[in-house]
């Protein structure tokens, strides 16, 4: 995944050193874009090993509309532990906004179901959008959404997705985000009877934390390997019926994992 390494190198070479909410400090750029052709392999980073189980379970958790980490803990996924309260709650984060966006009249809007219906009925629509950024509820969220809004696009029988990510932790978060939204695009395409097209990743503040510089330099020394292939159970035609066992990754041969601290 040369595109990811190019982003990392660009930030190290051209970024601006800034302070941040966590007190760690970052080097960042504003405005950047990467594109991944999902017909050329599954964009799971090969220059360090990623925990695919966490990526899949987190996505399934989002799609359930869940905002308590119990499901994640039950499946040995700890990526949200630092932000949950004593009861495991995170407030109205991604899953709530995706599946239960509160309307002023008391209704709750299922954005994912609505977009699915529109892709099938009106694929040329320019309103195939899901937003997790709800200004009225941001202060109630344990962590305001970093991957804030995504849009689908249908052309030539293929479904593509563009994500706008307002804040991007390049070393730890972005590899997960790429794989998660690529997988979501593939799942959406399957249940809509389409092929997967491109995943387009657009950033606002893309940053490397200062305590990740050494790890980034190590990763930049590694040569990317061939991308793996993600096999999805073709029998599943309901987006909300997918289970962890419906996904099988083939040909993943990454370089070793690189440890790095999370800034909370």
Curated annotation (Swiss-Prot):
Q: Where is the active site?
A: 146 (nucleophile)
Q: Which domain of life is it from?
A: Bacteria
- Mention any Pfam family matching this sequence: Thymidylat_synt
One GO biological process this protein is involved in is: dTMP biosynthetic process
Q: Just give the chief location class.
A: cytoplasm
Keyword Transit peptide applies: no
A cellular component annotation (GO) from this entry:
cytosol
- UniProt pathway annotation: Pyrimidine metabolism; dTTP biosynthesis
Q: Which InterPro entries match?
A: Thymidate_synth/dCMP_Mease, Thymidate_synth/dCMP_Mease_dom, Thymidate_synth/dCMP_Mease_sf, Thymidylate_synthase, Thymidylate_synthase_AS
- Indicate the family of this protein: Belongs to the thymidylate synthase family. Bacterial-type ThyA subfamily.
According to its UniProt entry, the function of this protein is described as: Catalyzes the reductive methylation of 2'-deoxyuridine-5'-monophosphate (dUMP) to 2'-deoxythymidine-5'-monophosphate (dTMP) while utilizing 5,10-methylenetetrahydrofolate (mTHF) as the methyl donor and reductant in the reaction, yielding dihydrofolate (DHF) as a by-product. This enzymatic reaction provides an intracellular de novo source of dTMP, an essential precursor for DNA biosynthesis.
- What is the protein's quaternary organization? Homodimer.
Q: What's the name of the protein?
A: Thymidylate synthase
Give the source species: Neisseria meningitidis serogroup A / serotype 4A (strain DSM 15465 / Z2491)
């Amino acid at each position: 995944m040369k595109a990811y390494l190019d982003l990392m190198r660009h930030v190290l070479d051209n970024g601006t050193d800034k302070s941040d909410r966590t007190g760690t400090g970052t080097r960042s750029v504003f405005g950047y874009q990467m594109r991944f052709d999902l017909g050329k392999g599954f964009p799971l980073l090969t220059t360090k090993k990623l925990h695919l189980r966490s990526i899949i379970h987190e996505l399934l958790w989002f799609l359930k509309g869940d905002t308590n980490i119990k499901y994640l803990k039950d499946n040995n996924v700890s990526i949200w532990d630092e932000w949950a309260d004593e009861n495991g709650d995170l407030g109205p984060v991604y899953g709530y906004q995706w599946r239960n966006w509160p309307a002023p009249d008391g209704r709750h809007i299922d954005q994912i179901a609505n977009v699915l219906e529109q892709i099938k009925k009106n694929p040329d629509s320019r309103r195939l959008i899901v937003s997790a950024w709800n200004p009225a509820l941001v202060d109630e969220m344990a962590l305001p959404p970093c991957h804030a809004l995504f849009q689908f696009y249908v052309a030539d029988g293929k479904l593509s997705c563009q994500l706008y990510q307002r804040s991007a932790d390049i070393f730890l978060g972005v590899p997960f985000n790429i794989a998660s939204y690529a997988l979501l695009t593939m799942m959406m395409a399957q249940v809509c009877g389409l092929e997967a097209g491109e995943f387009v990743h657009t950033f606002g503040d893309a940053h490397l934390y200062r305590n990740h510089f050494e790890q980034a330099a190590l990763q930049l020394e590694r040569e990317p390997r061939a991308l793996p292939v993600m096999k999805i159970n073709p029998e599943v035609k309901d987006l909300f019926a997918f289970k962890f066992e419906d996904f099988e990754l083939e040909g993943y041969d990454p370089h070793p994992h690189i440890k790095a601290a999370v800034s909370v």
